[in-house]
From Swiss-Prot:
The lineage of its organism: Eukaryota, Metazoa, Chordata, Craniata, Vertebrata. Component of the nuclear pore complex (NPC). Component of the NPC Nup107-160 subcomplex, consisting of at least NUP107, NUP98/Nup96, NUP160, NUP133, NUP85, NUP37, NUP43 and SEC13. Interacts with NUP160, NUP133 and SEC13. Interacts with NUP37, NUP107 and NUP43. Interacts with CCR2. GO terms for molecular function: structural constituent of nuclear pore. The gene is NUP85. This is Nuclear pore complex protein Nup85. Keywords: Acetylation, Centromere, Chromosome, Cytoplasm, Cytoskeleton, Disease variant, Kinetochore, Membrane, mRNA transport, Nuclear pore complex, Nucleus, Phosphoprotein, Protein transport, Translocation, Transport.
Length: 656
């Protein structure tokens, strides 16, 4: 189980008086609102806040960096690819795939670092330039740590190849030598350049002995007096035993050869062969692994881990992984010499050399400004089966916890939240719940964004979230008087109550305007019209109008009558339906049968005789309004005439 840490670091918010007790906090997915709630009472009726400001505190400001957004976007694809690596792969094939994924992550970090470096150089504002330079340093440290973790935890390099990997690691991250080399070689007389011996020394410190020999040949050409000792030094560099990638010799053979070579170097030192050249003698002491000679080159080494790798190269080139922590700690102590304390980066690298993965992740979580690094590194190490036994004290595992934190930060951004969805998908314990909580807080500014969110929810069968989003969009559409859109969203939400509300608005608009809006939607409701009685009535009433327009009068009359007798039509709409029957009653051909006419009469009498009930304004208007009275009289007259015609017609048909 993970041990509990000590007290968390206190973060002071500029402008907020932390000594006051009354503070209000409100947490969001990626930020927090803070304001003071203490008031100074001036008068009984007036309360004035002492600090009338609301502060927004963001925990992941890096998501708003344009360059770092590329890091997040490109690493997202690598992350998804890693999740799909076949679990059945084992041995070298699986290891090679995991190493390839690690290198892909590093290449993305390096690309962002180089772009950030260019932006820092081009920045006109000094403050921005410093900010970009600081970000470059952070990205550089991230790649440095990741590369070391790749060597120690993913490649798991054994003794021999381990040192070759560490040399490549140092050469990649201590790259000032390349610009220095170009400067020296570009001069008219390289061996007389002020930095010539510094360059040769750095090349030796980095184990680039072939390049160092080439530089010494220039010294030999320019100074015949020292040509002999330069040639001897060159031979020592050439014959130094190093385990190359394609070499088949065993570690024992390498150690024997290295021992003989080391003894030869000792003899040259004892014989004072290079006494006439302090520079060459210093190089010989370095190649003998003399710690004092190495520490004299502190400025050229620049950091303790460069000192560590050089020290191993010339004193224990077949170092075993298990012994690294001893050399790392002693190298750090020797290099700092008690003059300064280790930096956070030093502690992280030291933890890596001690093979303490969890301490590496913990230190990185504290030191780095966002969760990207620890989330992706931990996920990769988890795929290497290195974190299986580590659970956090609150029940989740470390991988999932860090991925959840990273994804939560992405949801604070207006567009990067889409990446966060996939990270939640690959958190089996709490990912689904977290996604549900975060996706409900996404501001649905546009319908296009809403459709994206909706599609994500539907793909994951998040029924409640789908319903909630559709309701929100339906309400927005109603407020904007877009009834067609509102009805569409309420149907999609399967919200019967809201569908009824929108249907009533459609019917009210029809009464006011005499026509329907959004006919295409109403005409194509299909089975969706069964969601609510009012929606069914709306669809069927529109169908009545369509039949009437197509002169299918008998079908239209039957449908109109069924809408009234089935009581599916709202009572407030009966007068409109009866008025719609008037043109059918006045047709030359008898449309309504005698029985149907009686039904219409019963509906009319039921409507006019019923006592007014609170809220039914249509009934009140029916009794009070002269226009409504005229309508009733016209209906009664038309119904009576139609009844007479229907009886005569039906009687004549029976007689024949």
């Amino acid at each position: 189980m993970e041990e509990l840490d000590g007290e968390p670091t206190v973060t002071l918010i500029p402008g907020v008086n932390s000594k006051k007790n009354q503070m209000y906090f409100d947490w969001g997915p990626g930020e927090m609102l803070v304001c003071e709630t203490s008031f100074n009472k001036k008068e009984k009726s007036e309360m004035v806040p002492s600090c009338p400001f609301i502060y927004i505190i963001r925990k992941d400001v890096d998501v708003y960096s344009q360059i770092l957004r590329k890091l997040f976007n490109e690493s997202h694809g690598i992350f998804l690819g890693l999740q799909r690596i076949d679990e059945e792969l084992t041995g070298k094939s699986r290891k090679s795939q995991l190493v390839r994924v690690s290198k892909n992550y590093r290449s993305v970090i390096r690309a962002c670092m180089e772009e950030m470096h260019q932006v820092a150089i081009a920045a006109k504002d000094p403050a921005n330039g410093r900010q970009f330079s600081s970000q470059v340093s952070i990205l550089s440290a991230m790649e440095l740590i990741w590369n070391l973790c790749e060597i120690l935890f993913i490649e798991v390099a054994p003794a021999g190849p381990l040192l070759l990997h560490l040399l490549d690691w140092v050469r990649l991250h201590v790259c000032e030598v390349d610009s220095l080399s170009a400067d020296v070689l570009g001069s008219e007389n390289p061996s007389k350049h002020d930095s010539f011996w510094n360059l040769v020394t750095i090349l030796v410190l980095q184990g680039r002995l072939d390049e160092a020999r080439q530089m010494l040949s220039k010294e030999a050409d320019a100074s015949p007096a020292s040509a002999g000792i330069c040639r001897i030094m060159g031979d020592l560099m050439r014959t130094m035993p190093i385990l190359s990638p394609g070499n088949t010799q065993t570690l024992t053979e390498l150690e024997l050869k290295w021992q003989h070579w080391h003894e030869e170097c000792e003899r040259y030192l004892q014989d004072s062969t290079f006494a006439t050249s302090p520079h060459l003698e210093s190089l010989l002491k370095i190649m003998l692994g003399d710690e004092a000679a190495l520490l004299e080159q502190k400025e050229l080494l620049s950091n303790w881990y460069h000192f560590l790798v050089t020290r191993l190269l010339y004193s224990n080139p077949t170092v075993k992984p298990i012994d690294l922590h001893y050399y790392a700690q002693s190298s750090l102590d020797l290099f700092l010499g008690g003059e300064s304390s280790p930096e956070p980066l030093d502690n992280i690298l030291l933890a890596a050399f001690e093979f303490d993965i969890h301490q590496v992740i913990k230190e990185c979580s504290i030191a780095l400004s966002n969760w990207w690094f620890v989330a992706h590194l931990t996920d990769l190490l988890d795929h290497c089966k290195l974190l299986q036994s580590h659970n956090l004290y609150f029940g989740s595992n470390m991988r999932e916890f860090l991925l959840l934190e990273y994804a939560s930060g992405l949801f604070a951004h207006p567009s990067l939240w889409q990446l966060g969805v996939d990270y939640f998908d690959y958190c089996p314990e709490l990912g689904r719940v977290s996604l549900e909580l975060h996706i409900e807080r996404i501001p649905l500014n546009t319908e296009q964004k809403a459709l994206k969110v909706l599609r994500i929810c539907e793909q994951r069968q998040m029924t409640e979230q789908v319903r909630s989003i559709c309701k929100i969009l339906a309400m927005k559409a109603v407020r904007n008087n877009r009834l067609g859109s509102a009805l569409s969203w309420s149907i999609r939400a399967k919200d019967a109550a809201f569908a009824t509300l929108v249907s009533d608005r459609f019917l009210r608009d029809y009464c006011e305007r005499g026509c329907f809006s959004d006919l295409d939607l109403i005409d194509n409701l299909g089975p969706a019209m069964m969601l609510s009685d009012r929606l069914t009535f709306l669809g069927k009433y529109r169908e009545f109008h369509r039949m009437y327009g197509e002169k299918r009068f008998a079908d239209a009359a039957s449908l109109l009558l069924s809408l009234m007798t089935s009581r599916i039509a709202p009572r407030s709409f009966w007068m409109t339906l009866l008025t719609d029957a008037l043109p059918l009653l006045e047709q030359k051909q008898v449309i309504f049968s005698a029985e149907q006419t009686y039904e219409l009469m019963r509906c009319l009498e039921d409507l006019t005789s019923r006592r007014p009930v609170h809220g039914e304004s249509d009934t009140e208007q029916l009794q009070d309004d002269d226009i409504e009275t005229t309508k009733v009289e016209m209906l009664r007259l038309s119904l009576a005439r139609n009844l007479a015609r229907a009886i005569i017609r039906e009687g004549s048909l029976e007689g024949s």
